[in-house]
A protein has these predicted regions:
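N-terminal Rossmann-like NAD(P) cofactor-binding subdomain of oxidoreductases
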Residues: 1-142
Length: 142
């Protein structure tokens, strides 16, 4: 499944590093409000809390970064609805920014995972508490 990761702060970097070697999920786009790809690469490779990332990313072409397992396009849109989503299956929004849920529901993706609580999400899920309530047929924004 192809993923767009929106935001690479503390949570976004942790998600990126967890999914970087996962063969079932591929982060193909990172959308980050920071317009400087060099800063994004540096913050992924040298995190002040998580430390150095062994499989370092580097800039390989204009707005693309790559390491030994992933090649990822970098965008810096201020809204998810402005991004070309034709090849994206899942959005993980770790930006912390509250998006308009009505707009998100119309995006052409299978699911949108918010890493922050939102009263208007289809379900606010906490592993170990209510994950059994998740129904992929009716819950798109999680």
């Amino acid at each position: 499944m192809k993923i767009l990761l929106n935001g690479v702060g503390r949570i976004g970097k942790a998600i990126l590093k967890q999914l970087d070697t996962n063969k079932d999920f591929e982060i193909v786009v990172i959308n980050e409000i920071n317009p400087y790809v060099e800063n994004i690469v540096y913050s992924i490779n040298y995190d002040s809390t998580y430390g150095k990332y062994e499989d370092k990313f580097k800039i390989v072409e204009n707005n693309y970064i790559q390491n030994s397992t992933s090649k990822i396009k970098i965008t810096n849109f201020d809204s998810l609805e402005k991004i070309d989503l034709k090849d994206i299956d899942i959005i993980i929004d770790s930006s912390g920014k509250k998006e308009d849920i009505k707009l998100l529901k119309n995006l052409p993706v299978i699911a949108i995972f918010l890493t922050h609580p939102n009263n208007e999400a289809d379900i606010n899920m906490i592993l170990g508490v209510n994950e059994k309530d998740l129904n992929p047929n009716i819950h798109k924004i999680i």
